[in-house]
C-alpha cells in the first residue's frame, strides 16, 4: 500500500499520568479518512493505546508531517517510559517547542508542522497492513492486522512539504547513520546516569541497520567493570530495542573505527570466557531473522568483552605502536609515495620511553 508516515511525529498521551509521547511509526493509507498506525511491541504509542482501550475508550492521536528535523530526532530516539520527547527537544534546542492544543484530541501539537491529522484509534478496528520495506533492509513484518486512525481533522499549509525516510540495507539506508548516532548518544547518556565510570566513547555501526551493533569504550578501573558496562549497555533504554551485538573495548580502541574494534575482538577476547548470550530480550516483528514471525518480539543479544583481561592487565603483552613522529612524516609525504586514498587515521602512539619498558 501507499505510506504517508515515515519521517513523522506521532503524538499520544498516557491516560494514567498524562505523559505526552512523540514517536515515529509507519502509517499506511487505508482510505480518504483512515490511516494505519503500526507500532512494534513495547513502543510507547502502543502502550498508550492499550491503556486507553482498557478503559473502554479510543486513543486520541495526532500525526504530524513536514516537521522540524530536531523533532524527528527526538521522536526516533528511545527515552524512558516516563519521559516526554518534547522535554528533550527543548533541552537540545535551547527553547521549548512552539505548540498549540488540538481541538479534536486535546494534545499539544507542533505549531510549525506542515501537515497535521487528528483523530482516534478505536478498539477492535484493524485492517490488513504491510508489508513495508524497513530499516533492516527487508520487508520484515508480513502483512497483518493493524489498528488504524479515523481522521477527524486535517490541517495543512499551502503547498506543504512531506518529509520521508528512505529504508534500505547497508549504506543505502539513509536513516542508518542518523539512528546510529542517536542510539550511541543515548546509550552513553544512560550509562552515565547509571553511574558507570571510565566511559570513553560509544558508537553504533550505521551499516548494521543503525541499531544492530553497539560498541562501548571504557578505561577499566576494577574487576567486573567491562562486564558491567556491556550488560548495562545491552539493556538500558537506549540500547534494549532490537540490537543484537554489544561489544565493550578498552580506552585505546576507537569505537567508531570498525577495524580497531575487530582487531580488539580478535586479540583480546577469549571466546570461551568473553561471550555471553541474553535471551528473551526486547525485539520486533521487523526482524527477519526469527521465524515463524510470531516469535519475533522476543529476541536475544550477544555480549562480547573485547577488553584486556583485567586480572592480568598489568602483565598483558605490550601493544606494538608506531612513533608519532614517524606517523606524521609518512602522512606528510603520502601523496609523494603515490599511495591511493587518505592516510590511515591513528590516535595511539608509542610512548617516548617505551624501549625502556620491554
Regions found by a protein language model. Give the residues of each.
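Internal mixed beta-strand/loop scaffold within catalytic domains of large alpha/beta enzymes
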Residues: 1-64
